[in-house]
C-alpha cells in the first residue's frame, strides 16, 4: 500500500500547503538561531574553555542531526501538521500523545512571553525614556498579524527574519577569520591571534567535566530545529522538501554554531567570555567596527521577533492538531479562507499573554514553575521522535512493506534513533546531577502526571456523559493498523 497521499495545496482540516523548501529551512534555522547563540554562547566558552565549548556544540549538533533524520523519515511518510503528538498517538499511546502536545505547546508559549519581554527591553537601547511595555505590545500586534493573515505571509516573514540572522553570522565568521589570520587588526593583539587562545592555558583549562555540565545548555540552544515536523502538513511536496530541508538545516546549523564558537574562542580570551556582553559585540568592537552595539542590538531584536513568530506558529498548530483529534474543543480547529486556524492562533496568543502576566505578578511561583516544566519539553519531544521512528520502521516491515518503498529513509537505522534516545536520557541524567537544574524535575514530574490524569479523566467523563465512546475517544484510539495509511483527523481510516 502506498504511503500517505499528498494533496497539492490543501491539508485535511483546512490548512493549506503553501510553504516551500526555502521556507522550511529558514523556519528551522530561525527557530534555533537566537539569544542562545548571540548572548549565551560566551557562558559556554567561559565554563568549558575554547576547545571544550566546540566539543559540546559538536555533540549537540550530532544529537540534532540524529533527531532530524528520524523526523525526516516520519514526516515524509506521514506529513501531518503538528506531527509530534500524532506520531506518539500511533506508536506510543494517546495519553503520551496528549502530554507531549501540551508540553510542547507550553514550551513555546512561555518562550513567546519571554521574547515579547526581551523585545521591549532591546528597544530601550534606542528609546531609553519609553516604557518597555509599549514596544512589547507593538511587537505582539505585529507577530499576531503575521500569523493570523496567511501561512504564506508567516513563511515569508520568517524567511527574511532568519535571513538577517544568517547574514550576521556569516559576516561575523568571515570578519573573525580575517582577524584571526592577521588580515584585520584587532585590539589586544600585535600579531595574528590564530588559535593561541585554544592552548595558552591548556587545551581544557577547566577539565573535562565542564563539557558535560554545559552540554544541557547547548542542547537547549538547538531546540527549535524540530519545527520542520510541525510545518510538514503545510508544505508543498513534502517528500522532496522535507529531506532537503533536514539536511541543509543541520549542515548550516553545525557550520554557524561551531564556526561562530571557534571564532569567538580564538579572538576572546576564555576568561573574559560571559553573559554580560554578547561575544559578537566584543569581537566587532575589538576590530573597531562602528556602531557594533547598535548593529548587534538590531540583529538580536530580529532574532527575538523571529523566535516569537515561530513560537506562535508552532503553538497554534499544536492547538489545531489537538482540536482535530478531539482532545480539546473542535472549534479551535476551524480555519479561515486563507487556511489559517484563527481560533488556535488566538488561543495560543492568549496563553502566551497569561504566561507574560505571570512573569510580572507571580514571577517566583507560577512563572518559575512554567519555565521549569517547559525547559525539559524539548528533550521529551526529541526522545519521543526517536521512539516513534523505531516503532514506525518495525511496523512498516512487519506489515509486509520494504525499506525501499519509503520515499525517504533515514541512514544508519537503528543506530541513529537508539543513540539519540541514549543521548536524551543522558541529558536528563545531567539535570539530576546538576543542583541548579534539579528543581525542574520537581515541577516536571507532577505536571506530566497531571496531563495523563487529566486526559484519561476527560475520556472517561465524556464516555459516561454520552453513554459510551464519544468522537473524542474514538479519534484518540482508532489508530490505523497499517502505518502506510493516510491519517484522518476524524479518527477513521481511508
Region spans (language model):
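Membrane-interface loop-to-helix entry segments
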Residues: 120, 133-190, 222-223, 246-250, ...
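Membrane-interface "cap" regions at the ends of multi-pass membrane proteins
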Residues: 1-42, 46-51, 65-69, 81, ...
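C-terminal membrane-solvent junction of multi-pass transporters and transport-like membrane proteins
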Residues: 160-161, 331-342, 382-434, 461, ...
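Transmembrane helix-boundary motif of multi-pass solute transporters/channels
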Residues: 17-124, 219-220, 225-228, 235, ...
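A generic transmembrane alpha-helix motif of multi-pass inner-membrane proteins
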Residues: 180, 366-369, 373-381, 410-494
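Helix-loop-helix junctions that connect adjacent transmembrane segments
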Residues: 3, 9-15, 54, 127-131, ...
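Hydrophobic transmembrane alpha-helices that form the core helical bundles
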Residues: 55-56, 65-148, 153, 173, ...
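TM-loop-TM module centered on a large, flexible mid-protein loop between adjacent transmembrane helices
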Residues: 86-88, 93, 125, 201, ...
Amino acid at each position: 500500500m502506498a504511503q500517505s497521499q499528498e494533496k497539492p495545496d490543501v491539508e485535511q482540516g483546512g490548512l493549506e500547503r503553501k510553504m516551500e523548501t526555502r521556507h522550511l529551512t529558514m523556519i528551522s534555522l530561525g527557530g534555533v538561531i537566537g539569544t542562545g547563540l548571540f548572548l549565551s554562547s560566551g557562558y559556554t566558552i567561559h565554563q568549558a574553555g575554547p576547545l571544550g565549548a566546540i566539543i559540546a556544540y559538536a555533540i549537540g549538533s550530532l544529537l540534532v542531526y540524529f533527531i532530524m533524520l528520524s523526523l525526516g523519515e516520519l514526516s515524509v511518510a506521514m506529513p501531518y501538521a503538528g506531527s509530534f503528538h500524532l506520531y506518539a498517538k500511533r506508536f506510543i499511546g494517546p495519553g503520551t500523545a496528549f502530554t507531549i502536545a501540551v508540553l510542547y505547546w507550553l514550551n513555546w508559549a512561555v518562550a513567546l512571553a519571554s521574547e515579547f519581554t526581551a523585545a521591549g527591553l532591546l528597544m530601550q537601547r534606542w528609546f531609553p525614556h519609553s516604557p518597555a511595555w509599549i514596544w512589547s505590545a507593538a511587537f505582539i500586534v505585529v507577530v499576531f498579524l503575521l500569523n493570523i493573515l496567511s501561512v504564506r505571509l508567516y513563511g515569508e516573514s520568517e524567511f527574511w527574519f532568519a535571513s538577517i540572522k544568517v547574514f550576521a553570522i556569516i559576516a561575523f565568521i568571515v570578519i573573525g577569520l580575517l582577524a584571526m589570520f592577521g588580515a584585520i587588526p584587532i585590539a589586544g593583539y600585535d600579531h595574528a591571534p590564530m588559535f593561541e587562545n585554544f592552548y595558552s592555558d591548556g587545551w581544557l583549562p577547566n577539565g573535562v567535566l565542564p563539557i558535560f555540565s554545559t552540554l544541557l545548555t547547548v542542547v537547549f540552544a538547538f531546540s527549535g530545529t524540530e519545527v520542520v515536523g510541525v510545518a510538514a502538513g503545510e508544505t508543498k511536496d513534502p517528500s522532496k522538501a522535507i529531506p532537503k530541508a533536514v539536511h541543509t538545516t543541520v549542515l548550516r546549523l553545525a557550520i554557524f554554531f561551531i564556526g561562530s564558537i571557534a571564532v569567538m574562542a580564538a579572538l576572546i580570551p576564555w576568561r573574559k567570555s560571559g553573559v554580560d556582553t554578547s561575544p559578537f559585540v566584543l569581537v566587532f568592537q575589538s576590530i573597531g567596527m562602528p556602531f557594533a552595539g547598535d548593529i548587534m542590538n538590531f540583529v538580536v531584536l530580529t532574532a527575538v521577533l523571529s523566535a516569537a513568530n515561530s513560537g506562535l506558529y508552532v503553538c497554534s498548530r499544536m492547538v489545531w492538531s489537538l482540536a482535530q483529534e478531539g482532545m480539546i474543543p473542535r472549534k479551535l480547529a476551524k480555519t479561515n479562507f486563507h487556511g489559517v486556524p484563527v481560533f488556535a492562533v488566538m488561543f495560543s496568543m492568549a496563553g502566551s499573554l497569561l504566561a507574560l502576566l505571570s512573569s510580572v505578578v507571580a514571577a517566583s511561583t507560577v512563572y518559575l514553575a512554567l519555565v521549569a516544566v517547559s525547559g525539559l519539553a524539548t528533550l521529551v519531544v526529541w526522545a519521543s521522535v526517536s521512539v516513534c521512528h523505531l516503532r514506525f520502521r518495525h511496523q512498516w516491515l512487519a506489515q509486509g512493506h520494504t525499506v525501499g518503498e519509503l520515499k525517504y529513509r533515514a541512514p544508519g537505522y537503528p543506530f541513529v534513533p537508539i543513540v539519540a534516545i541514549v543521548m536524551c536520557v543522558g541529558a536528563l541524567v545531567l539535570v539530576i546531577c546538576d543542583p541548579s537544574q534539579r528543581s525542574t524535575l520537581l515541577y516536571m514530574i507532577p505536571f506530566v502526571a497531571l496531563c495523563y490524569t487529566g486526559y484519561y479523566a476527560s475520556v472517561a467523563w465524556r464516555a459516561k456523559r454520552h453513554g459510551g465512546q464519544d468522537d473524542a475517544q474514538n479519534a484518540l484510539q482508532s489508530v490505523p493498523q497499517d502505518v502506510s495509511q493516510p491519517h484522518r483527523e476524524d479518527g477513521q481510516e481511508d
